[in-house]
Regions:
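N-terminal secretory signal peptides that target proteins for export/translocation
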Residues: 1-14
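Predominantly soluble domains enriched in secretory-pathway, periplasmic, or organellar proteins
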Residues: 16-28, 32-346
Length: 346
């Protein structure tokens, strides 16, 4: 018995053409739509120290969409361990403002936190540390959680004259380093014992601190000079390794996210330097208009946000071209700047 199959060529051709059209249409729609983001960009926050509020910037339109009242003199901000709470420190109001970093809604205000100028969480999420700039002490709090009735419990108050400015905690959560701005000193506090390990003289008006990823080299920005001092802190006592010349008024740090390079804002010179922490040399320079202060690096690694303290602006610096590509009007004396869509901080 012989079976005979007869193909309907006109019908088969029509089906093939239809399938090809559908495939090309799908590809075309994908190309037209472009890459799909897992989630939209989150707001950019800028603290306006003299206005007592926070500017919320839309990262798509680059417009200031609202101002959030906080307390008097908000200077610095930090993300809580749950990554759902952005904490703004209101220095002269003795309070903290908890903000949702995605919706920019205020969640709560925590009172009775004395003179919180600068703040840090320990990497193990157990310690919350504040520098009382006006009152000459460093406070060590036990973190209870953002939703706890009393999120912070004071464990120790460390006398820290004169004018504790900035803090940095090592990756093992064992020591907090403190710059003492008006006595030209730096000290280390042991978190286990809540005692001062050491205190040393440094250069003029030390401000921000940055510890390298290996916990070995501590950088100290000297706002009263044009240098960053590098100390080896791996031993019992710190040892000055090098003074790195950047530019006048070296003030704040922001890591590039590669565990090697660090930006430093030179406030008096209106410049920003990039330091190689392995060679301890300046490897690049960028413009920083209007008295550059705090910095944030966007997740693309190409855009540096800078609070222009004297110009009441947030400046956007395109790193590949070394140009200021945008400036947004914010409030008076803009200081801390932050967004959830940032590059790594070490």
């Amino acid at each position: 018995m012989q079976l005979t199959f007869r193909l309907n060529w006109p019908r088969l051709s029509a089906l093939c053409i239809s399938a090809l059209c559908i495939a090309f249409l799908a590809v075309g729609m994908a190309v037209w739509a472009g890459p799909v983001r897992a989630e939209p960009l989150r707001p950019i926050f800028v603290l306006n120290s003299q206005d007592g509020d926070v500017s919320v910037i839309d990262p798509v339109t680059f417009k200031q969409v609202r101002r959030i009242p906080t307390g008097k003199e908000p200077h610095h901000l930090y993300l809580a361990p749950d990554e759902k709470t952005l904490i703004v420190a209101n220095a002269t109001s003795n309070s903290l403002t908890f903000i949702d970093p995605v919706t920019a809604e205020v969640r709560r205000t925590v009172p009775n936190i004395v003179d919180p100028y600068h703040l840090r969480f320990s990497p193990d999420m157990r310690w919350f540390v504040t520098a009382a700039n006006r009152l000459n002490h460093v406070d060590l709090y036990r973190w209870q959680g953002a939703e706890a009735p009393d999120p912070l419990k004071l464990a120790a108050r460390i006398h820290a004259p004169q004018t504790p400015s900035h803090l940095f905690i090592d990756s093992q959560s064992t020591v907090v380093y403190v710059s003492l701005q008006d006595s030209d000193e730096m000290m280390a506090v042991d978190l286990a014992t809540q005692k001062v390990r050491w205190k040393i003289k440094v250069g003029k008006m030390p401000a921000d601190l940055h510890l390298t990823a290996d916990d070995r080299t501590l950088l100290v920005a000297l706002t009263g000079d044009r240098f960053v001092e590098a100390y080896d802190v791996s031993g019992q006592q710190p040892r000055l390794v090098k003074r790195v010349e950047t530019d006048k008024g070296a003030h704040a740090f922001r890591a590039r996210g590669d565990k090697r390079h660090v930006f430093v804002s030179n406030r008096a010179a209106n410049t920003i330097s990039l330091i190689d922490t392995q060679t301890l040399t300046v490897v690049d320079n960028y413009p920083g208009p209007g008295g550059p202060d705090c910095m944030e690096l966007l997740a693309d690694g190409k855009t540096l946000l800078v609070s222009s303290r004297w110009a009441r602006k947030l400046s956007f610096i395109d790193l590949p071209s070394k140009t200021v590509v945008r400036q947004i009007d914010v409030g008076r004396s803009p200081h801390g700047v932050w967004t959830l869509d940032h590059a790594p901080r070490r």
